[in-house]
């Protein structure tokens, strides 16, 4: 049985991956699950065809960042400095962290999530799902080897892709 996190080939019936320790408990369920399990384990993030991200500098005002999100109909901005990812600012950051602040007085760097967990375009959907579940994230940036933002994947994107693969 392949581990959904590291793809190590474990013995059937194992409860935990011998390589990375990830739980294999609900991954050995017969019938029904196989329809999308192969998609999750084998398809790479780049197969989802996600578009380019909207990036802003860390010194942009919070009100301007929220305006950018509204105009682009998105709920996640990638924060880049010199072309490299330094943070993420989401609608949740705006609602929870900045809701009672005078927005014009603050920069997005004051409320962004710095040094976010990232994905690579060749990571599998299983890795994306694992990182989202463990970290409690709804969005994860996709970066290249130089930490340059390529895209952002959301839990909704992954869900739609899996449902679409069911035919």
Named regions from a protein language model:
Residues 1-167:
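Tandem CBS (Cystathionine beta-synthase) repeat/Bateman regulatory domains
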């Amino acid at each position: 049985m392949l581990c959904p996190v590291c793809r190590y080939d474990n013995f059937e019936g194992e409860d935990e991956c011998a390589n990375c320790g990830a739980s294999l408990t609900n991954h050995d369920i017969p019938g029904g699950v196989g329809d999308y399990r192969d998609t999750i384990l084998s398809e790479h993030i780049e197969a989802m065809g996600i578009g380019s991200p909207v990036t802003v500098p860390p010194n942009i005002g919070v009100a301007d960042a929220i305006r950018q999100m509204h105009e682009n109909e998105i709920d996640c901005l990638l924060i880049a400095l010199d072309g490299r990812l330094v943070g993420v600012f989401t609608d949740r950051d705006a609602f929870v962290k900045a809701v009672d602040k005078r927005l014009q007085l603050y920069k997005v760097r004051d409320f962004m999530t710095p040094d976010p967990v990232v994905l690579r375009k060749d990571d599998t959907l299983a890795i994306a799902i694992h990182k989202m579940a463990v970290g409690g994230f709804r969005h994860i940036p996709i970066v290249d080897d130089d930490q340059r933002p390529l895209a952002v994947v959301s839990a909704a994107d992954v869900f739609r892709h899996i449902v679409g693969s069911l035919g």
